């Protein structure tokens, strides 16, 4: 019984430690990607491009295989809405009056018959506008999450 309790405590302590280590490793990523330096990461902006390069470099460090058409990057274009109820047009080719940006794509091969795809966007609202919590007030950097 004493051995079982000791083993349980050992496993519990190790699992808590690894969770904290993981959180500590994630914190600098979140701090950088949500920093004012990236000016809200508006789609196709310098800040969004810097964020994409940062994610690409993290993927490299984590030995995640590139799967985009251009290494880790997959270019796309879209035409922003001029009216809030208008449909958005997205394409993998250039659209007139469009914004061109990149998705970052990586692959972890677990040698399985099945693959789970997890997607997320790293661009955001930049300084606001349509969809912004602050669209009617002073211009502010939107660091993330108010459009979710």
Language model regions located:
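Structural recognition of the beta-strand scaffold that forms the well-ordered cores
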Residues: 31-34, 74, 103-107, 115-119
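Bacterial Sec-dependent N-terminal signal peptides
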Residues: 1-22
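Alpha-helical metal-binding/catalytic segments enriched in His/Glu/Asp
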Residues: 106, 114-119, 124-148
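Flexible glycine/proline-enriched surface loops and loop-helix/loop-strand junctions
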Residues: 38-39, 100, 136-138
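Periplasmic POTRA and POTRA-like interaction domains that precede
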Residues: 21-24, 30
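Acidic/histidine-rich, surface-exposed loop or edge segments in extracytoplasmic proteins
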Residues: 29-41
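A non-catalytic alpha/beta surface segment that caps or lines the substrate-entry region
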Residues: 41-107
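Short clusters of hydrophobic/aromatic residues that line enzyme substrate/ligand-binding pockets
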Residues: 38, 76, 142
